[in-house]
Amino acid sequence: MVINNCIKENIQFLTLYTFSSENWRRPKKEIIFLFNLLEVFLKKKINKLIEKDIKLNFIGELNKLPSKLQKLIKSSEKKTKNKKLLQINIALNYGAKIELINSIKNVIKKKIKIDEKSIGFNLYTKNIPNPDLLIRTGNTKRLSNFLLWQLAYTEIFFEKKLWPDFNAIDFKRILSTFKKIKRNYGAI
C-alpha cells in the first residue's frame, strides 16, 4: 500500500524502520519471526520490485545480522542497484545513537575536521536525502532512536493507528496536510 502510494505521489525515497538495535531485547521467537518475514518478503517480492523499478537500500549494523540474512540483503541490493523510480531504505538493526558514534569515530580515524558535513558524510544515510516527512504510527509520540541527526527539519506526524492498520486514506490525509506546510528550515 505505502509503496504504491509513494509511486503515485512521485515520492522518490521511503525509509522504513523495521528492526531497531534495541529490538534484540525482544523474545527470541519474535526476532526469528521478524527475520523470517523479511527473508520471505525479499525472496518473494524481489522480482516485483525490479519490475517496478524500485531500489532497495539497507541501513544499520548489518554485519551483526544472521549471515543468511546478510547474504540475502547484499543480493537484493545488488539486483536493484540501478533502479530509479523509488528507493526503499530499510533500517535494520539500526540505532541513531550508534550511527552517530560510528560516524564520529570514522571522522576521527580519517583525521579530518569534525563538523556537520564530515559527520553527515559518515552516516549510514550519507547517500540519502534527509526526510521531509516522518509518519510515526501506533499512538507513540517519540522518535525511538530513529534518524536523530537526519530529522532536524523533518515534519513529524503522529498517527494513532498501528502500522498494519495504516491505509491509503490515512497516507493521503497526512500527505495533503504536509503539502500545505510552508517549510522554512529555521528561517522566518
Which positions does each model-derived feature cover?
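Flexible, compositionally biased loop and terminal segments
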Residues: 1-188
